[in-house]
Amino acid sequence: MQKLEDMNLIDNFLFQEVARNKEYGGEFCRIILETILGREIKEVEIDVEVEKSIPGATLESHGIRLDALVKERDPRRMEVSTGSGAATYFDLEPNNYKISDPARRGRYYQAVVTSEHFGKGLDYKYLMDTYVIFILSDDPFGEDRMMYTIRNGCVELPDMPYEDGQITIFLYTKGKYAPSQELSDMLKYIENSREENVSNPSLQRMSDMVRETKRDRTVGAKFMMWWDYEADMKRHAREEGLE
């Protein structure tokens, strides 16, 4: 049985528990996003929703469960229609296993996040920007790159601006060609969240959060229930011949 103390941030249970913490969850997500995007996120409000379930449009359609959905609301960019700051949504998805059909998975996550948070009757110019970010221990495309950034564009005119506000990022923890040393170090720590992999102040802060989360008795109790549930699901899958 895996112990909570041995879990890494690439394990979605630990990632979710750090992100949902009311004291430091927003700061945790801010550090991750700033490192990935290479820019500061400041003078903004950050709301974090963890393990958010979004049902399909009908009972027969496919729903998803988001690991950590972060809303960056910037009061400097006011939306005329709502009178509030313009929002950008970031869906953070750590996965310690090989995901199937990453391109189409990313497409579906984008569609669901957008439709869930775009208000009825709003003009399309108010459609929010959305980032779906997968953090993976397995290379999704087999090109051995640390970062794959996916944007839509025009085939005939690849240099033509086509800003639809939709970006999907796949991060491979062991990949090459890192856009920054900070990102490389952070992904190494996310995959193996040990003190020896702390190499800068931001990672030290993340490590402090991880340590506090693992010491939380409430998290420990939730982990035991989560482990029992996962074990039951695997047992049922074996019995049904699905695993």
What are these regions (language model features)?
Residues 1-167, 177-179, 236:
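Accessory alpha/beta interaction modules
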